[in-house]
């Protein structure tokens, strides 16, 4: 069975929950991105690429619900996992903060252009969305954007950059992802994994 896990904030929790479910995947000791452990194979990928790998043939993955929603990935999601909790929020400079309804014509910087557009469409507000890949909170500081849509955990990064959270767009947590074909061809193996992870969660992971 092949697993793909995200590098970054979800990696440790992903390894731990799989280990407690009886699947021990050793992280790579070098910069290699594929590790084989007996009958398991572990791939490491950028968080945004995990659902793509699962969609296109990797059996099982773990990714944040933010990434899955942003990509509109065609994967099965049998379980929400009890880690990686945060939120996707709209934030802007403290001194120029306004309500969502007052944001017509604003420029919004984000790694999540699809989720940002849907949010503003739901609110009937026309904005320009600028896609960036990192350091989103810098955009308002240098005049590239009026506001940002980004992941917020503690809010410390926002405060450090003079930003305030205006509105939560969605709660985010880690999700277990399963490839649709693998669910049929490896049903017993995957079903057993899902049941074991459910037990681990029930026991208070």
UniProtKB/Swiss-Prot annotation:
Gene Ontology BP, a term: L-histidine biosynthetic process
Subcellular location: Cytoplasm
Entry-linked CDD domains: PBP2_HisGs
Cellular component aspect of the GO annotation: cytoplasm
PROSITE patterns per the UniProt record, alphabetical: ATP_P_PHORIBOSYLTR
Main location: cytoplasm
Purpose: Catalyzes the condensation of ATP and 5-phosphoribose 1-diphosphate to form N'-(5'-phosphoribosyl)-ATP (PR-ATP). Has a crucial role in the pathway because the rate of histidine biosynthesis seems to be controlled primarily by regulation of HisG enzymatic activity.
Molecular function as annotated in GO: ATP binding; ATP phosphoribosyltransferase activity
Organism: Thermococcus onnurineus (strain NA1)
NCBIfam families: hisG (TIGR00070)
Protein's name according to its UniProt entry: ATP phosphoribosyltransferase
Pathway in which this enzyme or protein is active: Amino-acid biosynthesis; L-histidine biosynthesis; L-histidine from 5-phospho-alpha-D-ribose 1-diphosphate: step 1/9
